[in-house]
Amino acid sequence: MKRVFFAALLCFAVFVPAAQAQIVQTIDHFPSQYVDARRVDILLPKEYEADKNQRFPVLYMQDGQNVLSDETAMDYTSWNAGNTAMDLAAQKEIKPVIIVAIWNTSDRYLEYFPEKASEYLTDDEVKEMMEIAKTGGSSKGVFMGNDYLKFLVGELKVYVDKTYRTLTDAQNTAICGSSMGGLISMYAAFEYPEVFGSAACLSTHWPVLFDENNTNPSEAIRKYMELHMPPSKNHRFYFDHGTGGLDAMYGPHQEQVDQLMLRSGYLKDANYATRVFEGAEHNEKSWRQRFDEVLLFLYGK
């Protein structure tokens, strides 16, 4: 059955040469038994073809349409992740890395919320979240974070590790996202600490409901985190936020997360980073400008 699954995937694969010998493999409809099929772009560093014996760490990134190409990104401004990684690797500042850009769907809001935190929400908060999801085009009506992670770990990562020369252990497997994508990246590392050794969460949308006067959803997530904290001895986390736009409301929430992480044994500027970027807003342009910081934390030599 697995052979049929992988063979089917290869039928959808399109190899596109990117700048300076990087290669992007696009799978237009990556199938899943847990969530709707979606596009996945897999960027191989130029070192991949240069040394056939070398294996590479892998970074799984959310909102994949905004990760690599300006043409597919919101407001035509991507994170420019591939070129940033290539430049840093060429300067010997980071290890070369495979980037897996996972496109979102209309179920984004439900897929990216840390599902186990929902048990600490009120019925009214859950109802409001379902209404928000509807405005985004989702008709599912249930939280989908656990199923999304099953897809990520049990299907996508299996395919990537089978198809490419990856370093498969947790130490070399990281996950990254912004806003709600930051929440699911944290959740992935907490739910699957044996799979993801590092998580980078930019402009993490702790308030969830876009209401800075209601702190309960943020508290619900922290309750979950406190009960499921990965061991600090072999995990690393990066958090940040700006001070403009939507990011202006994140500071108090992030400070409480910082306190929780430090109480749990994480060491600031060692295996834990928390940063504030003055004036940065809640958009791809801002995340693009500081993505090098993320890569240096995850893969710096």
Q: At which residue positions do the language-model features occur?
A:
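Bacterial N-terminal signal peptides
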Residues: 7-15
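Positively charged n-region of N-terminal signal peptides that target proteins for export
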Residues: 1-4
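Non-catalytic cap/lid and distal C-terminal segments of serine-dependent acyl enzymes
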Residues: 22-301
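Sec/Tat signal peptide C-region and signal peptidase I cleavage site
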Residues: 15-21
